[in-house]
């Protein structure tokens, strides 16, 4: 291109930072040129390294880079950058789609409307899109019956996973069911993505959602194009990430989702913050920007429901995940024996217990499986202990094994739930596999990943380069050979058998004494002359491979351990014996012949899986999507030219562009071509032509040039197939239009007849419309007259309004002056109202003091009377008690004698005694009932007094707090407070009298300790304080009952006189009596004696009860005494509040005095209202007190009744009488103009 470059030419020149930069040639000297770049720098470069720039290229770039005028690296790079700035992230390169990761959401590119648009369009008819690739693959599968596959490739973080999900979503939309049928296959296929992402994706340095496994989704379709089944294959899960995480990467997403689960799940699994788990806190990254782990956890559970994983299985899955976290927190220390280990501390023991509980296995068996190994020899089985380091390695190995088995179970469960269609003959495969990786530390996982990418690149080379060019040679067509870089040598270096790296690794794993150093030495010796293998300096175990994408240095320290595909026997036996069927299912018993089988390795198994994948890809027709990562910062709108150019070179995109432009991207066999495009030349059907001639006829008829006719195929240039499809669509459209024309003719004739029939009706309607228009004009004219009339009236009304407004303004001024005068008069009225209030307060206080003196005198007299009466009653009770005791002793003695002599009693005396005894019992019962009623009445009265006392005290406090109301309501509040105060003091005095009387009665009752009669008398005395009249009646009744009981006893005693005087003569008298004594009389007397004894016992019991009640009454008196003291304290507070109120009134009298002396007041009124303040109040003990809501501060006087002695009631009455006549008038005028009056006042 150097001959096309001259001075002032626009060229692309290499730049160390931006890869390529445009500029203008200033001067050319020999083979070098001086260029002025667009950033102002002068650069000198060789002409062979300069590329011309297309200055006429579209500003928005081109959709297919095969249409670029200059096809070279800087042009391709500039076109991608231009479209990326416009958010056009998709660009074609022939049939290859290049997708640049936007690192931001672009929902407008993937909604249902866009999918519908691409569903109806042909390939390249619309803008480049991932949906277009899915659409062409689907149409070719349906139309041609060929199986298709779409290979999504690119570096880590280039957007392969998201692109794959969009493809699957579009294919599900294209081949989905029209109606909702529950969990359809397409829904299950789509919802399998979030499940596998949760357990197989993790954050890496280059990507926040990097797939740590390979995935090939095979979507099956039925004969009508609907999805009928699917299968998912996974490759090489990165097991080491479970135990080892580099900063700032993260472990698998599922661990963080489970830590953010709902509280009930976290509590059930005993989880917490991710920082508390060793497998997660190795990195400082716990959160992802824009990702809510709690919401993602619920979304994953919903996706599991759709896929077909039951609730029980979901719980088991997350229980296993939680057990891995607890397993990682188990630490070991040295045991008692040498080279042995044990659980380190209590915390580690807790995590061991939780792990065994979650896995449902024995904790001691788990500890033995981690800390010991069984060695089987021909002679015996030896149990060997592991040191702490060996136990930690065993722990990590168990965690990796459990997670790997869990992931395999998930994939298998998804495949079983979705199901495969064994009768399907059409399928589309979508491959999403890890991209090329090169980190600071590259281990066995990176080796396998890059090996996979080498195989895919080889497949890409074979398809795009070898297969294309080989096809050209086979068909013997003219073409220009394109050189390309082949990576077959590096693939052979890795997989060739024998002698490849994988073969040597398997060989080293089978040797018991192999080490990473011996394995590396073997590699150095075997591949020392290989151009793709290099030995780094200063290392003994590292080696470097020259991949198609760049050089990668691998550390082989863990290659041997990671390549071994086996499970520790102790771990297998432990988990196979788990009580959880899910866990035991992950570790089924091994077949007996497995121990005798050949050695198996991860590398060999992965190589076999990869070969099967290549066979599947080779059996289908591929479509390629190359994903490109624009920058390593993972930020939107940042396009790193050097990074993108490296990906384009390593991905073979530039070479593919050259091949596609120089070659023929589309080819079809003659039969396929004629079956599809024969309708473009129908005359061929009339003759017998060979297939080759017929194909050439069609192409020449449509004016296509540049095509090639091979031996069995037609080779078309880029875009010619789309042109032929457009002609075919046009022919089909013309045929359809002819058919539609005949139908439309018939429909048009029918429509004409209807229109002619309708025209008559239209004309009639039109004439009616004209008449209506004339009528409308007439109505409009009439309306115009009305409008004019209303307008004139409005003008006149406006003039009238102005005149009225002027009059109102004048009247307002006059009324304002009158209102001011009226307001001044209202101030005078208000002052008089305040004076009246204070006068009423003074009168109330005077009345209160008089009532208080009278009440004290009455109380004193009442207490004296009660005390004298109680003294007399006490003496009388003592005398009665002594008499009662003597009579009861004598009665008891006579009753005993009467028992011996009872058979001589006459029937008449027995009847009288029985009647007397009944009356006595009746009187005793009535006396007891009276005593109980008296006690209950006294108790109720005491409770009422207590409630009244509390209510009065509360009213006193409320009256004290209410003193701070506004000045307009002070006179009402003052009257209420005075009334409450008087009521409170009366209640206090009454309560005091009650408590005093009760205390005296309790002391008398305690000294006497009387039985039934004295207890009743004491109850009567207690109730006398509240109900004096009732008490007198009850006392008289009690005395009458007592007298009657004594008479009954005397009657009984008289009946026993004869027997008591001569006891020994009684027997002789009885013997002389000739009349027999009836047995009934003896039984009657005996019963009467027993009844008397029972009565005596009852009386004793009642005496005990009376003594107990006396003690209770004493306690009640003590409690009431305390309440009385509290009441007295509240009374003192109330008196203090009242004194403050009185002093506030005196201060406001002084202020009223100053107001009444103002010039606006009447002279006669002011002269008759002097208010004098007591000077002695200023020297009181209370210095100052202020109301809570008042604007005044005043000193508080001492609580004496002389504070208002200086007020002259006659003078206050003069003021009240003068103003009372005008009070009504002032009130009415105040309501008429309140606002203006206050403005003048202030």
Swiss-Prot record:
Assembly behavior: Homodimer.
Gene Ontology BP terms: actin filament-based movement
Annotated region (Disordered), positions in chain: 869-893, 908-1042, 1175-1242
Keyword field contains Nucleotide-binding: yes
Entry protein name: Myosin-16
Keywords of this entry: Actin-binding, ATP-binding, Calmodulin-binding, Coiled coil, Cytoplasm, Hydrolase, Motor protein, Myosin, Nucleotide-binding, Repeat
UniProt feature coiled coil, ranges: 1079-1142
Gene Ontology MF annotations: actin binding; ATP binding; calmodulin binding; cytoskeletal motor activity; hydrolase activity
């Amino acid at each position: 291109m150097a001959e096309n470059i001259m001075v002032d030419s626009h060229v692309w020149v290499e730049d160390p930072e931006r890869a390529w930069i445009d500029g203008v040639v200033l001067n050319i000297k020999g083979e070098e040129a001086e260029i002025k770049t667009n950033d102002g720098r002068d650069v000198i470069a060789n002409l062979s390294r300069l590329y011309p720039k297309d200055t006429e290229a579209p500003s928005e770039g081109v959709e297919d880079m095969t249409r670029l005028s200059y096809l070279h690296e800087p042009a391709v790079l500039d076109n991608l950058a231009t479209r990326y700035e416009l958010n056009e992230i998709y660009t074609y390169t022939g049939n290859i789609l290049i997708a640049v990761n936007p690192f931001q959401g672009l929902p407008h590119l993937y909604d249902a409307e866009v999918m519908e648009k691409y569903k109806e369009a042909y390939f390249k008819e619309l803008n480049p899109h991932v949906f277009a690739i899915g659409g062409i693959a689907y149409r070719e599968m349906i139309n041609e019956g060929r199986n298709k596959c779409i290979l999504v490739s690119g570096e880590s973080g280039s957007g392969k996973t998201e692109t794959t999900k969009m493809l699957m979503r579009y294919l599900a939309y294209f081949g989905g069911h029209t109606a909702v049928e529950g969990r359809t296959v397409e829904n299950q296929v789509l919802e399998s993505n979030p499940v596998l992402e949760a357990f197989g994706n993790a954050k890496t340095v280059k990507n926040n959602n990097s797939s740590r496994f390979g995935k090939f989704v095979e979507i099956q379709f039925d004969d009508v194009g609907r999805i009928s089944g699917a299968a998912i294959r996974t490759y090489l899960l990165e097991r080491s990430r479970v135990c080892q995480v580099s900063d700032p990467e993260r472990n698998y997403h599922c661990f963080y989702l489970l830590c953010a689960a709902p509280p009930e799940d976290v509590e059930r699994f005993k989880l917490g913050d991710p920082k508390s788990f060793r497998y997660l806190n190795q990195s400082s990254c716990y959160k992802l920007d824009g990702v809510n782990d709690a919401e993602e956890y619920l979304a994953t559970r919903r996706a599991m429901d759709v896929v077909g994983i039951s609730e029980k299985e979901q719980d088991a899955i997350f229980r296993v995940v939680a057990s891995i976290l607890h397993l990682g927190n188990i630490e070991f220390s040295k045991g008692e024996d040498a080279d042995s280990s044990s659980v380190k501390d209590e915390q580690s023991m807790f995590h061991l217990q939780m792990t065994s509980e979650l896995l449902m296995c024995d904790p001691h068996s788990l500890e033995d499986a981690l800390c010991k190994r069984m060695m089987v020899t021909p002679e015996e089985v030896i149990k060997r202990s592991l040191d702490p380091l060996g136990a930690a390695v065993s722990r990590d190995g168990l965690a990796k094994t459990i997670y790997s088995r869990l992931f395999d179970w998930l994939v298998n469960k998804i495949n079983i739930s979705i199901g495969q269609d064994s009768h399907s003959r059409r399928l589309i495969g979508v491959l999403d596999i890890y991209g090329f990786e090169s980190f600071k530390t590259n281990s066995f996982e990176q080796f396998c990943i890059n090996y996979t990418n080498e195989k895919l690149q080889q497949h890409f080379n074979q398809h795009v380069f070898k297969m294309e060019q080989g096809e050209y040679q086979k068909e013997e067509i003219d073409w220009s050979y394109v050189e390309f870089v082949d990576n077959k040598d590096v693939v052979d270096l890795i997989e060739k058998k024998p002698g490849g790296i994988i073969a040597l690794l398997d060989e080293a794993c089978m040797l018991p004494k192999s080490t990473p150093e011996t394995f590396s030495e073997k590699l150095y010796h075997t591949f020392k002359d290989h151009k793709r293998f290099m030995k780094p300096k200063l290392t003994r175990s590292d080696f470097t491979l020259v991949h198609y994408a760049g050089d990668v240095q691998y550390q082989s320290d863990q290659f041997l351990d990671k390549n071994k595909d086996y499970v520790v026997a102790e771990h297998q036996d432990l988990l196979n014996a788990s009580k959880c069927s899910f866990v035991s299912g992950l570790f089924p018993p091994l077949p007996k012949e497995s121990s005798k089988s050949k050695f198996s390795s991860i590398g060999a198994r992965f190589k076999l899986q990869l070969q099967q994948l290549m066979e599947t890809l080779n059996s289908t027709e591929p479509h390629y999507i190359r994903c490109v990562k624009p920058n390593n910062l993972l930020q939107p709108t940042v396009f790193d030219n050097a990074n993108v150019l490296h990906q384009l070179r390593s991905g073979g995109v530039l070479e593919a562009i050259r091949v596609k432009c120089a070659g023929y991207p589309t080819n079809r066999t003659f039969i396929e071509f004629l079956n599809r495009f024969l309708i473009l030349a129908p005359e061929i059907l009339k003759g017998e032509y060979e297939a080759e001639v017929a194909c050439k006829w069609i192409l020449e008829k449509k004016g296509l040039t540049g095509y090639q006719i091979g031996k069995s195929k037609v080779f078309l240039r880029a875009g010619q197939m789309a042109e032929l499809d457009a002609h075919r669509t046009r022919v089909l459209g013309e045929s359809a239009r002819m058919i539609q024309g005949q139908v439309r003719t018939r429909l048009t004739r029918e429509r004409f007849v209807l229109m002619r029939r309708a025209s008559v009706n239209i004309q009639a309607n039109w004439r009616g419309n004209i008449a209506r228009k004339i009528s409308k004009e007439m109505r409009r004219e009439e309306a115009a007259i009305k409008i004019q009339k209303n307008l004139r009236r409005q003008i006149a009304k406006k003039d009238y309004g102005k005149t009225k407004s002027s009059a109102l303004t004048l009247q307002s001024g006059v009324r304002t002056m009158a209102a001011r005068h009226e307001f001044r008069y209202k101030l005078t009225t208000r002052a008089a109202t305040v004076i009246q209030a204070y006068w009423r307060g003074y009168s109330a206080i005077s009345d209160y003091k008089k009532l208080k003196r009278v009440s004290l005198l009455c109380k004193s007299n009442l207490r004296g009377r009660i005390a004298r009466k109680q003294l007399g009653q006490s003496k009388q009770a003592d005398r009665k008690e002594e008499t009662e005791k003597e009579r009861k002793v004598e009665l008891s003695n006579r009753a005993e004698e009467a028992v011996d002599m009872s058979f001589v009693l006459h029937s008449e005396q027995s009847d009288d005694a029985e009647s007397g005894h009944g009356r006595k019992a009746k009187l005793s019962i009535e006396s007891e009932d009276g005593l109980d009623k008296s006690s209950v009445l006294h108790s109720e009265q005491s409770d009422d007094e207590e409630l009244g006392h509390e209510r009065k005290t509360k009213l006193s406090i409320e009256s004290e707090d209410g003193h701070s109301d506004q000045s307009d309501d002070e006179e009402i509040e003052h009257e209420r407070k005075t009334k409450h105060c008087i009521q409170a003091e009366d209640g206090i005095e009454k309560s005091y009298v009650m408590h005093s009387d009760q205390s005296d009665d309790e002391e008398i009752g305690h000294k006497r300790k009387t039985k039934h009669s004295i207890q009743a008398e004491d109850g009567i005395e207690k109730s006398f304080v509240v109900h004096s009249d009732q008490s007198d009646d009850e006392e008289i009744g009690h005395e009458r009952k007592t007298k009657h009981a004594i008479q009954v006893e005397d009657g009984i005693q008289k009946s026993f006189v004869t027997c008591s005087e001569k006891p020994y003569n009684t027997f002789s008298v009885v013997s002389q009596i000739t009349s027999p004594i009836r047995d009934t009389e003896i039984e009657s007397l005996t019963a009467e004696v027993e009844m008397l004894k029972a009565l005596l016992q009852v009386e004793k019991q009642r005496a005990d009860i009376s003594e107990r009640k006396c003690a209770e009454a004493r306690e009640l008196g003590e409690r009431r005494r305390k309440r009385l003291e509290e009441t007295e304290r509240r009374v003192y507070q109330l008196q203090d509040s009242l004194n403050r109120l009185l002093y506030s009134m005196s201060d406001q009298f002084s202020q009223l005095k100053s107001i009444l002396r103002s010039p606006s007041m009447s002279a006669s009124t002011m002269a008759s209202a002097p208010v004098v303040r007591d000077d002695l109040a200023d020297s009181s003990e209370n210095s100052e007190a202020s109301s809570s809501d008042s604007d005044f501060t005043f000193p508080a006087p001492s609580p004496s009744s002389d504070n208002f002695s200086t007020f002259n009631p006659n003078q206050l009455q003069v003021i009240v009488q003068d103003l009372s006549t005008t009070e009504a008038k002032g009130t009415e005028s105040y309501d008429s103009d309140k606002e203006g009056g206050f403005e003048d006042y202030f």
